[in-house]
């Protein structure tokens, strides 16, 4: 019942640009599967235009699994900076490690994203965010932590994570 209320038919005269533009940033050379799975989920859940900024070694696998996706090399910092404003949603972190490269990508997103964009921070980007005491870029920022990442973000030990305690940190 919930799915039927959330999913509607597309208009006959609509085009893919009407259904959102999403940029996914992640997928280190040895972890390309995570960003490809995230891009697939984004596409199959209805996003109109999906662009994946990832390591160049993931390009062939990306196109073989998701030919409708667009590719950007996440090491092309200038292109990343200039393209960020064209997306409605920016996802950063699937298939990344807590390292300087992820931190650079995350800081680029934080510095160049607009208040109108949604930012989803996942995976290694969560650990980078927590470890470097970065500021939340805007009110439309979403974190997707598992228990250990939530411990890093909130300072609450895994054994003490309870709904009411977690909520206090969020308020």
Regions inferred by a protein language model and the residue ranges of each:
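Small-residue (G/A/S/T)-rich helix-start motifs and N-terminal tracts that mark the onset
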Residues: 1-119, 127-142, 147-171
């Amino acid at each position: 019942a919930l799915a039927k209320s959330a999913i509607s038919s597309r208009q006959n005269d609509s085009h893919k640009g009407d259904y959102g533009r999403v940029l996914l940033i992640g997928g280190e050379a040895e972890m390309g599967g995570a960003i490809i799975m995230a891009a697939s989920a984004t596409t199959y859940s209805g996003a109109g235009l999906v662009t994946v900024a990832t390591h160049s070694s993931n390009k062939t696998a990306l196109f073989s699994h998701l030919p409708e996706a667009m590719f950007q090399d996440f090491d092309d910092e200038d292109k990343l900076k200039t393209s960020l404003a064209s997306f409605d949603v920016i996802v950063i972190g699937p298939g990344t490690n807590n390292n300087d490269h992820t931190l650079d990508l995350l800081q680029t997103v934080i510095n160049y994203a607009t208040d109108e964009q949604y930012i989803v921070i996942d995976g290694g980007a969560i650990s980078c965010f927590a470890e470097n005491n970065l500021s939340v870029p805007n009110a439309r920022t979403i974190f997707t932590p598992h228990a250990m990442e939530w411990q890093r973000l909130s300072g609450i030990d895994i054994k003490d994570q309870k709904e009411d305690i977690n909520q206090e940190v969020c308020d």
